[in-house]
Amino acid sequence: MARVSENLSEKMKALEVALSSIEKRFGKGAVMPLKAVETVEVETIPTGSISLDIATGVGGIPKGRITEIFGVESSGKTTLALHVIAEAQKRGGVAVFIDAEHALDPKYAKKLGVDVDNLYISQPDYGEQALEIAESLINSGAVDVIVVDSVAALVPKDELEGEMGEAQVGKQARLMSQALRKLKGAVHRSNTALIFINQIREKIGVMFGNPETTPGGRALKFFSDMRLEVRRLGDVKEGGEKKGYRVKVRVVKNKLAPPFQEAEFDVIYGEGICRICDIIDTAANLGVITKSGSWYSYGEKRLGQGREQAKKYLLEHPEMLEEIERKVREVSGLVRPDTENSVGEKSE
């Protein structure tokens, strides 16, 4: 027993010498006991969908982390990202949209609630330029959310300047790998939410297993703290007319909460995510609103027969809608975002 104690004492002395040397070279706090590290709750930006906020387990898109939103074309990826930007701006945050696809529609963004007059946009010519711009903005510490749309459009400069049909094997994957190694630490230090929008492609000749993959290599999958898969389920109709589409978002990777949670919500053409519909559906699933047959009720008050009637009633009674949303957040364990506590304020 005495020998064990003596060995432990010698180890601690050796550790103290090593820590002292490290501190001189790299500064105080380079290595420290875990108990000395202050635990800071991760700040988040709401997604515009309360069901998706719940599915993420932390209340939205995490700041100081990298998030990938991927899916097939026209599934609602950019719409979701624009809602995140709108929510950040409502809370005093600064947002940047790096439009590598050169396809952002300011009129559509405005309809989703984005303050286009205060949205910063970049339309880079090639992939390296886009990622260097993102790095500079992140290092400034002044930006709350950066959206890169999309990874598939981050074409390396060599490929753009090369001949048509010339083989450019793995250049984009190497570009993403090099960039993400630099961006990961910078994102954490600046507390910026970095969102990459990505597409789904199919591998050629895959007979077994999932043939679907995303461009840009494996680096983004590895460095992302959260990955959201967006799927379009079907059309939303009203009186036989198509008004929008139903979306399912699956959290396929989550380093902050249990993964594989799912959320479904409606996206209305020209309006974006139907917030009231989402609140009604989520409240009904959690028992905040009761559904008897086709009737929706909140407490003793009948809201209407069918979701459209309930939606109409809550539009006319916004104070009740606010109360229902608050109860949904309480029941689900989410803290209601306080618009007075700006996400634009950087943590010390």
UniProtKB/Swiss-Prot annotation:
Belongs to the RecA family. This is Protein RecA. One of its GO terms (biological process) is DNA repair. Can catalyze the hydrolysis of ATP in the presence of single-stranded DNA, the ATP-dependent uptake of single-stranded DNA by duplex DNA, and the ATP-dependent hybridization of homologous single-stranded DNAs. It interacts with LexA causing its activation and leading to its autocatalytic cleavage. InterPro entries: AAA+_ATPase (IPR003593), DNA_recomb/repair_RecA (IPR013765), DNA_recomb/repair_RecA_CS (IPR020584), P-loop_NTPase (IPR027417), RecA-like_C (IPR049261), RecA-like_N (IPR049428), RecA_ATP-bd (IPR020588), RecA_C_sf (IPR023400). It holds the Pfam family RecA. It is found in: Cytoplasm. Keywords: ATP-binding, Cytoplasm, DNA damage, DNA recombination, DNA repair, DNA-binding, Nucleotide-binding, SOS response. The gene is recA. ATP binds at G71, V72, E73, S74, S75, G76, K77, T78. SMART domains: AAA (SM00382). HAMAP family: RecA (MF_00268). Its main location: cytoplasm. One of its GO terms (molecular function) is ATP-dependent DNA damage sensor activity.
